[in-house]
Amino acid sequence: MKNIVVVGAGFAGLWSAVGAARKLDELGVGADEVGITVVNRDSWHAIRVRNYEADLDAVRVPLADVLDPIGVGRVEGEAGAIDLVEKRLAVETANGPVVLPYDGLVLAAGSQLHRPDIPGLRQHAFSIDTHGEAALLEAHIQKLGTTPQGPGARTVLIIGAGLTGIEAACEMPARLAAAGVGDGRGILA
């Protein structure tokens, strides 16, 4: 049996796995001939471009809902060493290490936000790069309406004017108002 292993379940990884499954189905190749496995840190597909939203429930899709019906396997864990000669991928799971043999390997692990070493950035800045970080921002926004504030404390500076930054800037006034921060303002930089 041949094995295709996809590392990462973001858009690139998920579409790679789904596309491979669809193509194999079109060719009449059964799961007993070629297996597809997705390796991901958790059991969710995160729609990162929507992490600016206040309601984060809809920005994560259970991988089981997408992959199980089409016969794609899942391994939850951290991908590690790749043995290019033996064609094996080491994965650290909650139950210990696992080695996955592969005939085809797709590396779609995604990106990670680079946080420069700027004094005060880690203490006073929030990110929406991950679901967890977006949840921390939402918790902070909810506290703003009830916490005594000093000058400038109700100002939100959004750094980055790409799609996500613009979406965050457009949504921020409504989020601040919903949290009781009627005089809050957002600045897009």
Language-model features: locations:
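Beta1-alpha1 glycine-rich phosphate/pyrophosphate-binding loop at the start
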Residues: 1-76, 157, 163-189
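FAD-binding core/adjacent interface of flavoenzyme oxidoreductases
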Residues: 72-155
